């Protein structure tokens, strides 16, 4: 089977790696173009780009697939199927119709729940008890195509964005191979659009004094490692935390261990990181902190 693989971030790496070890032929890899990053702002290739080059596979980095020249190039690879995993570009109808078996997508949620760009974060923010992977046929809608295979698992108490991301990436690659091995036997299941909800891209990682305690706790998990508080205009990331039901004045840091009183409970930071410093336990952090800072309110 001739496969075009379309993906960019680390989530897609497991699937590409498994395909490269399979009997199928990956004839091309489509990924986002290198973009500047780091202090030197040097162009950095996506994780998928790096693996493809190491495997001597042609890499394509178009800025859009809406142009006829790009569509003709895609067609010339003569793909039987295109596999999409967090690619980052919209696939127009002309592209969707080229492969014999169409374009199939690895989506890290139990569709139709959490269609969109940030399903893992929204799964945690909503307090969902389970999650999973949906292998779906791409159409012109937003994650609205028929489902070819779906598998779920329970979310554990200690799971955060990273642990769920890694579990879903592994499950997605395994499910993908099952679908491809039985591609002509698939019985597509139509999604119920009435049950759909959407996972918009997350851009605000701040924990606010007005947040409920459980919401703040979920933010720590969902936005790992980016959730933060601000004290005296200093940004402090909270990488791990717990919470308890006791609470006092909302937004107040209530003791020398930096427990944060919020609506409905107290957030208890366990691992934190000040800007420009390495992560550390809350105990080590407090020892190196001005005592005045731990008697403030978060902003």
Swiss-Prot record:
UniProt binding sites for (6S)-5,6,7,8-tetrahydrofolate: 109-112
Substrates-to-products reaction catalysed: L-methionyl-tRNA(fMet) + (6R)-10-formyltetrahydrofolate = N-formyl-L-methionyl-tRNA(fMet) + (6S)-5,6,7,8-tetrahydrofolate + H(+)
Any one Gene Ontology cellular component term annotated for this protein: cytosol
Primary enzyme class: transferase
Molecular function per GO: methionyl-tRNA formyltransferase activity
Gene3D superfamilies on file: 3.40.50.12230
Keyword annotations of the record: Protein biosynthesis, Transferase
Protein origin, superkingdom: Bacteria
Documented EC number(s): 2.1.2.9
SUPFAM superfamilies assigned: FMT C-terminal domain-like (SSF50486), Formyltransferase (SSF53328)
InterPro entries: Fmt (IPR005794), Formyl_trans_C (IPR005793), Formyl_transf_N (IPR002376), Formyl_transf_N_sf (IPR036477), Formyl_transferase-like_C_sf (IPR011034), Met-tRNA-FMT_N (IPR041711)
Matching HAMAP family: Formyl_trans
Family designation: Belongs to the Fmt family.
Reported function: Attaches a formyl group to the free amino group of methionyl-tRNA(fMet). The formyl group appears to play a dual role in the initiator identity of N-formylmethionyl-tRNA by promoting its recognition by IF2 and preventing the misappropriation of this tRNA by the elongation apparatus.
Protein name: Methionyl-tRNA formyltransferase
Organism, scientific name: Wolbachia pipientis wMel
């Amino acid at each position: 089977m001739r496969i075009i693989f379309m993906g960019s971030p680390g989530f897609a790496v497991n699937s590409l790696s498994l395909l490269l070890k399979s009997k199928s032929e990956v004839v091309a890899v489509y990924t986002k173009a290198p973009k500047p990053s780091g202090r030197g702002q040097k162009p950095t290739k996506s994780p998928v780009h790096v693996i493809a080059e190491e495997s001597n596979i042609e890499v394509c980095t178009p800025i859009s697939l809406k142009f006829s020249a790009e569509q003709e190039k895609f067609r010339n690879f003569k793909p039987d199927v295109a596999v999409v995993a967090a690619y980052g570009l919209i696939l127009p109808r002309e592209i969707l119709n080229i492969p014999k078996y169409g374009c199939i997508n690895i989506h890290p949620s139990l569709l139709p729940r959490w269609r969109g760009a940030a399903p893992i974060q929204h799964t945690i923010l909503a307090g969902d008890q389970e999650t999973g992977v949906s292998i779906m046929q791409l159409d012109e809608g937003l994650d609205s195509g028929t489902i070819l295979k779906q598998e779920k698992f329970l979310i554990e108490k200690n799971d955060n964005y990273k642990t769920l991301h890694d579990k879903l990436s592994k499950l997605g690659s395994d499910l993908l191979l099952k679908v491809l091995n039985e591609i002509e036997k698939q019985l597509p299941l139509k999604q119920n659009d009435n049950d759909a909800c959407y996972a918009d891209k997350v851009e605000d990682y701040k924990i606010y004094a007005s947040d409920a305690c459980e919401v703040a706790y979920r933010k720590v998990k969902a936005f790992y490692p980016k959730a933060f508080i601000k004290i005296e205009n200093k940004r402090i990331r909270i990488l791990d935390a717990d919470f308890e039901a006791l609470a006092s004045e909302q937004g107040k840091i209530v003791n020398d261990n930096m427990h944060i009183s919020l609506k409905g409970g107290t957030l208890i930071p366990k691992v934190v990181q000040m800007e420009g410093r390495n992560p550390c336990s809350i105990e080590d952090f407090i020892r190196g902190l001005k005592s005045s800072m731990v008697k403030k309110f978060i902003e």
